[in-house]
Amino acid sequence: MDFIVVKRSRKKKNGRGKFPKVSNTITQGDTDLWSQDTLQRKLDNSREKLEYSEFLKSVQSQLSEFKDPIHKCIILGLGRIHTLTASLQLSLFFEIMKIFNLQPRFCSFYDPAFLKDDVEFLENKGFCVLPDPPTPSCLKYTLLYMPHCPTSLYETWLAAYVNDDPRHFIMCGNNLQLYVDNKPSKEIVSTYPNVYKMCTKNYYTRLLFPEFPNVYAFNDLSFHFHDAQSFVEKKQPSKFVDASSVAEHPS
């Protein structure tokens, strides 16, 4: 197993957003519809960027050691698919599906930013696109795929696990520890108590993804899971990642 040490700066990064909106893309005025062929070309281009990257090789190597079953996935806040960030994050999700043998019919997307072209594109690939936001709940064998969502949305979903059974928590999203490290304890406890509790009580282990060059799509992305024994122990050199700030889209 790769052990990754996080070097943290003293710079504070406030989690913005009072309410849990879920889109991770700035969509104001983004109302143009795109053809399915164009969306596919954009996705293909993004998948090419990932295909031979060291980033993907590292992610595949590390996640392939995860032994707990994952049967379903909820994908929140992807954003408009024509954007580079969303197409890259969707490309990574396809790779994660391969690693865990996830079937499209067990993967549900929700983002209020989606327009009919996005919905059609995802449904044509066999995914479920939810018309309404899913109710946060403690879900067994379910991956939450939430790159760069607002802190308030992480807080809302974490509450379901903290108040029920944290052992079922599996999430691919921002490195939660950075929210705790970059805010005074009193502030994080009052604003995001479940993020604080999840981190300080060691309810989960996190695996930090490596840096991806030139684009913002995967900044501070981590795989969070409860049981450290889920990974096969391997003696390998430590890796260092500079995670000085938390990537988060405006809410």
UniProtKB/Swiss-Prot annotation:
Record keywords, A-Z: Cytoplasm, Nucleus
UniProt-listed InterPro entries: SRR1-like (IPR012942), SRR1L (IPR040044)
Pfam families assigned to the protein according to its UniProt record, in alphabetical order: SRR1
Compartment list: Cytoplasm; Nucleus
Gene Ontology CC: one annotated term: cytosol
Keyword Nucleus among UniProt keywords: yes
One of the GO BP terms on file: DNA damage response
PANTHER family from the UniProt entry: SRR1-LIKE PROTEIN (PTHR28626:SF3)
The family this protein is said to belong to: Belongs to the SRR1 family.
Protein name: SRR1-like protein
